């Protein structure tokens, strides 16, 4: 085989990340070994799965392992696996570049964070853990051979911005990463990573639950290599090391009784599984028995991942069959709105070579999914009832995702509605549930009032709020983008209809108030009988009706929709998604007691044909549109008319 040697540059983002690692100020440098072991474990998982496919590589799972070789004299540490390996192109693609969304966000947060736990969390979340080796290395060498291919690839870099890659004739199947260690420096927390006790400590802390045996081998023994059945060389320990006890326990934590697992073990397993080095907010350990048996160990994180709302974000949990790993991110086991849940599901009755296509149709998987969802929602409900602080944390981090379930999961809609926690005008510092809102409703109130918008400040200052504030009615303040959608889909909660205060007619007066003000109302209808149709004609391109308002107390006008109209914010959202949305005509409501509206009526009575009067009508509509956060059709014209009217008033 011809040897091809190239010196290539890292992608720009990779160079920046390398510089952060090479000149690292992060306190927890031990994580480099955790990341190398995690990568090795992934490679072994992929090889075992590939072996299940027809014409896949022949593999004896009992021989699959991870080795750690420490050479004290050479000051090197090698992490070796006999997994799937990589081709030359894969090495360039996976190590020479960072082909991931959110890279800029990762770099920014790493620069901001000097805390070891925080930085290791970010490194793990973004899947760029290989680069962490440069926190402890002067140079890193990688040798890899792809399963089923002859030859291999050697990669080497000192982290200065370039790397050397070459094709080699002889490479065992799998990957070996050799870290040429920097000198010890206790002040910089650079420890002796060739020390056996230090290696054992790191493996026990971070990688105890790795499913493959991790063995520590001496440098001379590691040079003795076995051979595969097919004759290709395979990395492995020498005979004198074959019986060594693994450094990790490899315990299937989910298979043990819940009473026998302590919090520290749950935390360690969660950290291994998720690369989130804070503890989980909630642990859900369950077992299903009967016609279809399974165990599940699920975790609700303490904080949302950075990519929770990105299209290519991780979702789903790990699937095992009889303790054998099948796949990561099994989306078929949990709905999308629970994508933040991490964990493991181990079934007893599925085939080891089950495919995603079969999973989608398998009734047993659908049964497990239903049970998992109900258990997760019940656990969140228990937090809501018994631990308000942790529940508020959960809702702050994942509430927006959970509310997506109101659109996706009709079977559990009522359960999710019971969990919904939103801001309201009742208490600016404490969100409320719908159940709590109902308990505070006024005696004559039959509807749950809400208003959607971009922010709490915008909603609180909306003209639509004026009458509700004046009469002491509580209004839900909904600011998540998903709120615009689910309130349209959900008709009621606990028999109480949900009512947007920006739609339809609003009448908050009691029967006695209506009787006492009936004469006044009738007089106002007569006074404005000429102005209202005139305004409707002037603004016919934008409004379908002009009427007197019962919801305004201080603003001159506002725009409202009919009961089943789409909100302006929802229209804007659909347009941003590329949908063609016509601009529906709205209803313009006037405050008959406002000085501007009263002046407009008087001016109309004096000269209904005045051009200036028509301009004022246009300005009035524009003001109402801006007050609800809408967009003017012609901002330049609006500004010019406003300037002219202001000049006339001076």
UniProtKB/Swiss-Prot annotation:
Give any Gene Ontology cellular component: cytoplasm
Superkingdom is Bacteria
Q: Which InterPro entries match?
A: HATPase_C_sf, Heat_shock_protein_90_CS, HSP90_C, Hsp90_fam, Hsp90_N, Ribosomal_Su5_D2-typ_SF
* Record GO terms (molecular function): ATP binding; ATP hydrolysis activity; ATP-dependent protein folding chaperone; unfolded protein binding
Its predominant location is cytoplasm
Annotated segments matching region B:
357-572
The annotated region (Disordered) lies at 222-245
Concerning PROSITE patterns, the annotation shows:
HSP90
According to the record, the residues making up region (C) are: 573-650
| Classification via Pfam families | HATPase_c_3 (PF13589), HSP90 (PF00183)
Give the span(s) annotated as A. Answer: 1-356
Q: Which SMART domains match?
A: HATPase_c
Q: Which UniProt keywords apply?
A: ATP-binding, Chaperone, Cytoplasm, Nucleotide-binding, Stress response
Q: Where in the cell is it found?
A: Cytoplasm
HAMAP family for the chain: HSP90
* Subunit text: Homodimer.
Family assignment?
Belongs to the heat shock protein 90 family.
Q: What does this protein do?
A: Molecular chaperone. Has ATPase activity.
The protein, known as: Chaperone protein HtpG
